[in-house]
């Protein structure tokens, strides 16, 4: 089994791996998240909960009053997918930062202004255009939201990681003491395999002898995925 992250594709090492896959036999390459592993209750839920928590932290004492009519969590699964499809937000930490900023700006910086009426789906459409034009992702975020509404990338990262890994695994993998959700159990435990057990043998019977995974997962996320796919 060969791992190839997208940013390695044009490196000597990446080209070597691809050559190994292609040498003399058919190969099947799979994406991981959403294809081989169901991440609806892990990565996606972590983004939603992290956005909600970080938005409340950013708003401080005004949070309850400003979010009176807001949904809980502040972001729905379909809205997360729209931003993923837009481009520029494959990194969940960047997406958490962006969604938090849009919510903070909506209820505080843009309060009473036309921007406050723009839905997340509409923002995702704008993000898609920006990505197509070469200035998507976090760069686009700083173009549309004021700096006062944007949380630090470090805070966005760790609140997401604490929800995803949980307190115990955050300490184990990163030596990180949780400060946002210290009692989080970890949504990573909700991940499960999507691929039917008969698929790989079926492909092998058709002549596919090499299988690979193409993924943006990194660090401890990789063995975590392997444990699900090959327990």
Residues covered by each model-derived region:
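Phosphate/oxyanion-binding active-site loops and adjacent basic polyanion-contact surfaces
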Residues: 39-43, 88, 92, 187-192, ...
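Short, acidic loop-to-helix structural element flanking the phosphoryl-transfer center
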Residues: 16-18, 24, 29, 139, ...
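A general structural signal for alpha-helical elements within enzymatic catalytic domains
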Residues: 52-56, 101, 227-230
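Non-catalytic pre-domain segments flanking phosphatase-related domains
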Residues: 1-30, 62, 73, 81, ...
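Active-site neighborhood of HAD-like aspartate-dependent phosphohydrolases
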Residues: 3-77, 94-97
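A contiguous, well-ordered beta/alpha segment that forms the leading edge of an enzyme domain
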Residues: 77-85
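Cytosolic catalytic headpiece
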Residues: 62, 85-100, 105, 111-118, ...
């Amino acid at each position: 089994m060969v791992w190839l992250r997208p940013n390695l594709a044009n490196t000597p090492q990446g080209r070597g791996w691809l050559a190994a896959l292609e040498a003399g036999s058919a190969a099947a390459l799979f994406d991981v998240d959403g294809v081989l592993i169901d991440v609806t209750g892990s990565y996606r839920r972590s983004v939603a909960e992290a956005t909600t928590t970080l938005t409340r932290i950013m708003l401080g004492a005004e949070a309850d009053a400003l979010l009176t009519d807001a949904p809980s969590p502040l972001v729905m699964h379909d809205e997360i997918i729209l931003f993923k499809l837009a481009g520029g937000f494959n990194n969940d930490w960047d997406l958490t930062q962006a969604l938090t900023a849009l919510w903070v700006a909506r209820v505080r910086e843009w309060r009473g202004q036309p921007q406050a009426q723009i839905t997340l789906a509409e923002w995702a459409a704008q993000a898609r255009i920006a990505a197509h034009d070469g200035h998507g992702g976090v760069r686009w975020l700083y173009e549309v939201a004021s700096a006062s509404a944007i949380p630090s990338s470090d805070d966005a990262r760790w609140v997401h990681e604490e929800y995803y890994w949980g307190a115990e695994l955050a300490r184990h993998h990163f030596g990180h003491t949780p400060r946002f959700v210290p009692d989080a159990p970890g949504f990573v435990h909700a991940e499960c395999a999507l691929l039917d057990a008969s698929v790989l043998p079926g492909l092998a019977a058709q002549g596919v002898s090499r299988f690979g995974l193409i993924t943006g997962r990194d660090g401890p996320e990789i063995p975590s995925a392997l444990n699900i796919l090959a327990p």
